[in-house]
Amino acid sequence: MQLHILNNPKDAALAADAEFLKQSLFNLLHEEASPLVVETVKLLSTSDDSAALIEKVLPQLDEQQTHDLTLACGLFAQILNIAEDVHHERRRQIHEEAGRGGAEGSLTETVRRLKAGKADGKSVQRQLDNTSVTAVLTAHPTEVQRQTVLSFNRRIRALLPQRERCTNADALARLRREIDTILLGLWQTSETRRHKLSVNDEINNGVSIFPMSFFEALPKLYRNMEHDFQMVYPDVCVPNILKIGGWIGGDRDGNPFVSAETLRFAFRRHADAVFRFYRGELDKLYRELPLSIRRVKVNDDVMALAALSPDEELARTEEPYRRAIAYIMARAMGKARALGLGMGCKFGFLEPYASAQEFLDDLKKLQRSLIDNGSRLLAEGRLADLIRSVSVFGFHMMPLDLRQHAGKHADVVAELFQHAGLEDYNSLNEEQKQAVLLRELSHQRPLYSPFITYSDHTRHELAIFNEARKIKDEFGEDAVTQSIISNCEQPSDLLALALLLKESGLLAVENGKPHSRINIVPLFETIEALENACPVMETMFRLDWYDALLESRGNIQEIMLGYSDSNKDGGYVTSSWCLYQAELGLVELFKKYDVRMRLFHGRGGSVGRGGGPSYQAILAQPAGSVAGQIRITEQGEVITAKYADPGNAQRNLETLVAATLEASILPDKKDPDAKLMQALSDVSFKYYRELITHPDFIDYFLQTSPIQEIATLNLGSRPASRKTLARIQDLRAIPWVFSWMQNRLMLPAWYGFGSAVETLCEGNPDTLTALREHAQSNPFFQAMLSNMEQVMAKTDITLAENYAGLSESPDKAKIIFGMIKEEYRRSRKALLDLLQTEELLRDNRSLARSLALRIPYLNALNGLQVAMLKRLRKEPDNPHALLMVHLTINGVAQGLRNTG
């Protein structure tokens, strides 16, 4: 353990917080657990080999003691995470109060860089007007903690900063008692879900982030953005450049439980949350604006609103703003009632607003009147925040994307063709498919007939598109704007979706020209698909019909890039380089056809699924690939870590905006040496494929990781694998990466790198020099190495060897693990060599410190997991062993702070 890293004076408060929480947890353990468990946990905190200690102690523990020890280790990881989060916020505030300027990734610093880069106000305004940044919340099942447990953690996080402000022993004792009480509740709450989450559960979890965080964070962030820009560019106005999007309730790729009903449920929940927020803000505004016409002038349009008010109290006759607000609230709540939401309004209900824009227009009348008549401060406070909120959230709160596998779309098209007496669609070649689809897309005549009985699949798919059309009509055009084609491989995949949109009334054809209400978004996710992305899109851009469709959508084409499957296919190095090359090619292609590009990055939380710091990731994109337009998926434990707290949410969203603007306005960057990167990719790919195609590899993976137990964890509504667990390609990327995180190999994020560097540099010092230069100066290569460094710091080859002992074929496992161990040695050596350092994380003290705090408990959980997996494999029906495995999976995920 690198305990010396905690001796920095800047970390004194962190050390005190950690000690305070640990003492509370020990108080709890003394009351709730046996002395042997308490003593073991104390020994773990100073042990250099936690797993060995666990192996020694475990035979002395009964089932209850084993359970308590496992739970205690997981709780220690949780409370240390909380202490870390509080410390990050503390250091940020100290930094700001010291007036040291903005940190990297802040808008303050970005605006300074724009000015230093000679960007003038007009060019900045032009870029802002063409900027769209969206964080898209998905239901990918990587959040191992229950919402109940997360709520306990948030309560501790809110209380902990009070420790520094306690001025006497009594205050500290009261704080201690509050935290002890929460920890007791946490101890006595089940850590694991007993039942599988439903899609509706996932929807509710996603919605809960908004009142918890986003409703506060987004308006505040916009206010800060306006301030930062106006300090340097006084005439710049900040449009709605940042939004939150979602997939939860509309993503049916591999999830048979997503339906038209779940889509409708999602928007009802969205609307319920956002209208409750609006009602609360209008009520506060009503109390804030008792301005009297005896004291202020009021614009005529506000007086007109007041005249229509249902608030007829005598005391309000001289308070036109309050009366106008009552009118606005009654109309807004009238809309809520029209949408079927069961919420009341103290002023009754008036004619519903037809659109969020009407609601916005009335609020702006209040603002204009306040500014015109000397009340600017009131106009720029809560009212301005509410105006921004309505303009961002509308009546739908967040837009949802639709997503489905290309093959599922094709099956619906084939059945429509069959019943219409047309060609056997699935037997046609690609050229023929394009021809028949374009024929059917050249006119408005539908293929669907209400008098024909279609398969459940076809009815299910068309019902979702029809529901999306109704939702757009009711909640606003922005409620559903994207339909994503996963596993997109051919131009016909895009045209097939277009046909389904036409059949559902979401795409109209007039005089042969299409007009679509939804963006058609291809998702290229495998290595082969990424390499084929440009030919597919060039074929589309050459079609006059598709050109007209793009014109109806503002001449913007969104492309989604999948990080997960490409990594599983080819390893981290090859995946990263293929993605970069695909983006380079797409930039040139879009320029050639004068189409604006928006890239949607399907990244996970872990490096093996494209994760890593967002700021560096965006700046590492090829020049021209961002251009103000970017969407990024956020999922599972990442949503909790980044967005469950308003302060965290504000900073993480600010980072996305800052990086997007820097990458767009200051894109002066050199691409990496293509020949060098291709060579690195080719050799890395060769070694990675040698491993995963080894005949004994799949059995090794299934037996030496908790992959099969993860499938029973009830993390999400979607099945863990597409078919069976017999082939790597049938396994979803999330449990694939999740499992390698659990057994501490993190293999998808580095395997093949070391052999590639060694092969290329052997006898070739110029190549080593070139790679070192790239490591120092090229954003793409720097980001790749930085992510790899973070993962390798969490890798523990000794612990991983314990997992290898779970194999049912020791001789075969010895060969596979030998390959992995040797590649780890090479990759670590190569990484240190290119970074020109002797230790990992030398320049990332924050992560090194964080790991040092948690590693004793994390390693202990791994030791417990190996022992419990061994027991479970011998006794498959042992419920205690399965529960312990589940608890250790939870604990390890918390200790690592990312999963999949």
UniProtKB/Swiss-Prot annotation:
One BP annotation, GO: tricarboxylic acid cycle
GO cellular component terms listed in the entry, alphabetical order: cytosol
Keywords associated with the record: Carbon dioxide fixation, Lyase, Magnesium
Entries under InterPro entries matching the protein: PEP_COase (IPR021135), PEP_COase_bac/pln-type (IPR022805), PEP_COase_Lys_AS (IPR018129), PEPCASE_His_AS (IPR033129), Pyrv/PenolPyrv_kinase-like_dom (IPR015813)
HAMAP family associated with the record: PEPcase_type1
Record protein name field: Phosphoenolpyruvate carboxylase
Needed co-factor(s): Mg(2+)
Species of the source: Neisseria meningitidis serogroup C / serotype 2a (strain ATCC 700532 / DSM 15464 / FAM18)
Residue positions of the active site: 140, 568
Family: Belongs to the PEPCase type 1 family.
Top enzyme category: lyase
EC number(s) stated in the UniProt entry for this protein: 4.1.1.31
PROSITE patterns: PEPCASE_1, PEPCASE_2
Known function: Forms oxaloacetate, a four-carbon dicarboxylic acid source for the tricarboxylic acid cycle.
Domain of life: Bacteria
GO MF: magnesium ion binding; phosphoenolpyruvate carboxylase activity
Reactions it catalyzes: oxaloacetate + phosphate = phosphoenolpyruvate + hydrogencarbonate
